[in-house]
């Protein structure tokens, strides 16, 4: 069981909220996740219910359909993301791919196009969780929006170099930067700057 766990909490399954207005799809998705060891803490049939359940249960992840009654998935995702409750994976039909950019702007961390299999779903979940942790960690380090954007840009470039030059995965590269900052009692921004300087890539002017 590799999908729902992390090194730190290997025995604890991820807690998932599912928001999907089609009952059969919602049931299939819940069964699929339970078989992989995830815990389903709530099931919502519309966007408003999804927001309410997210605030109530504080899940580790929200899987949200884009098109839902009462309140669409993008609007609901925007509120959940703005409150930093949990990372969000959005589900969209092939014909709705134009909505993916809107979903990303709303704060979704990953998306899947229906129909999908469990082999598609697990990587999307892990990507969403990883990105959410990065953003949360970076926001805890810097106060202003402009500083956050600058720091994220530097960290993204440093991660790219670590992936290219040292063969790290994206999550491993971020963990390396985060751990280096903690070990040296400095900021992730400073570590990213050192990585860029050391690997010979000039900083932006």
From Swiss-Prot:
Gene Ontology cellular component terms for the protein in this record: cytoplasm; peptidoglycan-based cell wall; plasma membrane
Record-level Gene Ontology MF annotations: anion binding; RNA binding
Record's subcellular location: Cytoplasm
Residues in Response regulatory domain copies: 15-129
Cited PROSITE patterns: ANTAR, RESPONSE_REGULATORY
Pfam families: ANTAR (PF03861), Response_reg (PF00072)
Keyword field: Acetylation, Cytoplasm, Phosphoprotein, Stress response, Transcription, Transcription antitermination, Transcription regulation, Two-component regulatory system
Domain ANTAR: 135-196
Regulation: The NO arm of the pathway is further controlled by sequestration of PdtaR by PPE1-5', controlled by the Rip1 intramembrane protease. PPE1-5' directly inhibits PdtaR and derepresses PdtaR targets, which are usually repressed by the PdtaR/PdtaS cascade.
Post-translational modification (record): Phosphorylated and activated by PdtaS.
4-aspartylphosphate carried by residues: 65
Keyword presence, S-adenosyl-L-methionine: no
An individual GO BP term: phosphorelay signal transduction system
Primary localisation category: cytoplasm
Role summary: Member of the two-component regulatory system PdtaR/PdtaS. This two-component system plays an essential role in mycobacterial adaptation to poor nutrient conditions. PdtaR probably acts at the level of transcriptional antitermination rather than transcriptional initiation.
Subunit architecture: Monomer. Dimer; when bound to its cognate DNA.
Domain notes: Contains a C-terminal ANTAR domain, which is a RNA binding domain.
Name recorded for this polypeptide: Transcriptional regulatory protein PdtaR
The species this protein was found in: Mycobacterium tuberculosis (strain ATCC 25618 / H37Rv)
Lineage: Bacteria, Bacillati, Actinomycetota, Actinomycetes, Mycobacteriales
């Amino acid at each position: 069981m590799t999908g729902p766990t992390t090194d730190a909490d290997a025995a604890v399954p991820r807690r998932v909220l599912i928001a999907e207005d089609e009952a059969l799809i919602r049931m299939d998705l819940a069964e699929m996740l339970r078989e992989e060891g995830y815990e389903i803490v709530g099931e919502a049939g519309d966007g408003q219910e999804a927001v309410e359940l997210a605030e109530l249960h504080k899940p580790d992840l929200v899987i949200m359909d884009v098109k839902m009654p009462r309140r669409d998935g993008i609007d609901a995702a925007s509120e959940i993301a703005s409150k930093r409750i949990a990372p969000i994976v959005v589900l969209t039909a092939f014909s709705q791919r134009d909505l993916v950019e809107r979903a990303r702007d709303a704060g979704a961390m990953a998306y899947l196009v229906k129909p999908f299999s469990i082999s598609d779903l697990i990587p999307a979940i892990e990507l969403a969780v990883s990105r959410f942790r990065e953003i949360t960690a970076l926001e805890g380090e810097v106060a202003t929006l402009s500083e956050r954007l600058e720091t994220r840009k530097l960290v993204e470039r440093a991660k790219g170099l670590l992936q290219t030059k040292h063969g790290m995965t994206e999550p491993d590269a971020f963990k390396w930067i985060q751990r280096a900052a903690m070990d040296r009692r400095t900021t992730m921004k400073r570590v990213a700057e050192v990585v860029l300087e050391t690997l010979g890539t000039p900083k932006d002017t």
